[in-house]
Design a protein with these regions (language model features):
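Conserved beta-hairpin
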Residues: 42-60
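Conserved acyl-donor/pantetheine-binding loop and adjacent beta-alpha core of acyl/acetyltransferases
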Residues: 57-85
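Conserved GNAT acetyl-CoA-binding A-motif
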Residues: 109-122
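Conserved active-site alpha-helix within GNAT-family acetyltransferase domains
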Residues: 99, 122-142
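Conserved acetyl-CoA-binding loop-helix of GNAT-fold acetyltransferases
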Residues: 88, 94-107, 131, 135
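C-terminal "cap" of GNAT-fold acetyltransferases
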Residues: 143-157
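A short beta-loop-alpha structural element at the N-terminal edge
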Residues: 1-14
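A short, internal acetyl-CoA/4′-phosphopantetheine-binding micro-motif in the GNAT/acyltransferase core
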Residues: 84-93, 122-123
């Protein structure tokens, strides 16, 4: 498996993988996925030959991204690397791909001297994602309630 930066050529496959992770990943259109890639400070994919197996998109503070979760971090922290989404193709889960991606995110944030920001659904609950983030020493720093769901806001310093 190889890690590489994502490009606009990867958007259709990224979108498909993202759809497999709903509702945990949050639904976006292909155009919104392309926009996220343009906003990103870090966008990595894990590939086996030419097949995209999983990806992560991280945003810096201050972009035009309209997510309420992202805005929550923007209002409270000056510097961070926001994990907007991490997704692994259904048939490739439980193979360490998510961990491989997060290790790169953490290494990049450590190089920049900024914390990693993320959120996990609390309603409906996503216990697998919470355990995953706890393994990487994320701590809860708040909770945000939306109409149909709530999310725990996490930070890794």
């Amino acid at each position: 498996m190889d890690l590489r930066e994502l490009t606009q050529h990867d958007v259709a496959t990224m979108w498909s993988i993202n759809e497999q992770g709903l509702p945990g990943t949050g639904q976006v259109s292909k155009q919104e996925m392309a926009d996220l890639l343009n906003f990103s400070v870090l966008s990595l994919g894990v590939f086996r030959e030419q097949e995209l197996l999983g990806f992560v998109i991280c945003l810096p503070p201050g972009t035009r991204y309209g997510s309420l979760n992202y805005a929550w971090f923007n209002q409270r922290f000056e510097a961070f690397m926001y994990v907007d989404r991490i997704a692994v193709a259904q048939q490739h889960r439980d193979q360490g791909i998510g961990s491989m991606l997060y290790e790169q995110v953490i290494a990049s944030s450590d190089e920049q001297g900024v914390p990693v920001a993320a959120e996990v659904n609390s309603t409906p609950p996503n216990p697998g994602s919470m355990r995953f983030h706890e393994r990487f020493r994320f701590k809860e720093v708040g909770e945000l309630h939306h109409q149909e769901k709530s999310v725990m806001m996490l930070l890794r310093t």
